């Protein structure tokens, strides 16, 4: 089975440098909608046996744009299990301001999640955010077919995908985070062991 993970398109809050989390949301930028249409065309011949997205509007809209371009129509299923990392009091605030107020915590969130003290902000722990998404992914083991589309969010997907690949918390951000509208592909035979086929790819924009 191939799992196609897509981070949602760039939003107004992304442009403003604000943390969205699970309780904040903002519309996709027009430029990002065009990118997602290009991604949809890039994946248009891929036969998805199922398609899932976070139930947050920016992810749902992203998934809908991709599926509208596909040659094999399929319904989208939404789930809170794929929501962005629930970041409590960090949500809605500008990253530049948070770096000034909490330099060590923001550094940890970006580079070493083992040192991120989530409780300061009333946020999910790294274990909580990855476990809910990992549990959902593993629940798909009885899904028949060869390909599944999964649309979610940057912080949660970066940590969750690398957790599926066996990385420790301090290693989850080692290669940085996922880019908006990027595609990451994992393969699995048993939904217990996963292999990385493609990471954070946006090469379709060069076509």
Outline where the language-model segments fall.
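Extreme N-terminal starter segment of soluble prokaryotic enzymes
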Residues: 1-4
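Active-site metal-binding loops of divalent metal-dependent hydrolases
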Residues: 9, 154, 202
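Phosphate-coordination/substrate-recognition cap region in phosphate-metabolizing enzymes
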Residues: 38-107
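Acidic, low-complexity terminal tails and accessory targeting/binding regions
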Residues: 68, 72, 87-100, 146, ...
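Short glycine/proline- and acidic residue-enriched helix-loop micro-motifs
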Residues: 107-128
């Amino acid at each position: 089975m191939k799992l196609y993970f897509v981070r949602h398109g760039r939003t107004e809050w992304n442009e403003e440098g604000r943390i969205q989390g699970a309780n904040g949301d903002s519309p996709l930028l027009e430029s990002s909608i065009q990118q997602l249409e290009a991604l949809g065309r890039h994946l248009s011949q891929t036969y998805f046996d199922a398609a899932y997205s976070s139930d947050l509007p920016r992810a749902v809209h992203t998934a809908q744009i991709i599926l509208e371009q596909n040659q094999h129509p399929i319904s989208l299923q939404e789930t809170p299990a794929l929501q962005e990392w629930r970041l409590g009091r960090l949500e809605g605030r500008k990253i530049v301001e948070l770096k000034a107020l909490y330099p060590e915590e923001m550094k940890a969130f970006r580079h070493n999640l083992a040192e991120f003290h989530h409780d300061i902000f009333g946020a999910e722990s790294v274990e909580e955010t990855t476990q809910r998404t990992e549990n959902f992914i593993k629940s798909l083991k009885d899904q028949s077919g060869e390909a599944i589309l999964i649309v979610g969010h940057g912080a949660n997907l970066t940590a969750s995908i690398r957790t599926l690949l066996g990385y420790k918390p301090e290693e989850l951000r080692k290669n940085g985070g996922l880019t908006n509208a990027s595609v990451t592909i994992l393969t699995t035979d048993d939904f217990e062991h996963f292999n990385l086929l493609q990471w954070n790819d946006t090469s379709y924009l060069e076509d």
